[in-house]
């Protein structure tokens, strides 16, 4: 796709850290929508594209509700808000570590 920044390779830790950040920002603003700054959420810069990718991943997983704008052929987010499933992920002890672990040990502790 012309004009679209490639997705750069990330570690699972980096992916989960960014997704946790987005969830926490939504949690802090609930029940209001968080605004998607076009400089932070766009298809043309590598870091901003990662934010778009992670935001839609969380939305498709049921943790965030995203209002979608239109930018030609690309889904572009305008606002996002935490869903009840997203709140559970933050509030239920151990659930965030199970779903989006930052360390291998977090997942192992949850299993035992």
How would you label these PLM feature ranges?
Residues 2-29:
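Short alpha-helical segments that sit at the start of domains
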Residues 26, 30, 90-93:
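Generic structural signal for hydrophobic core residues of well-folded globular domains
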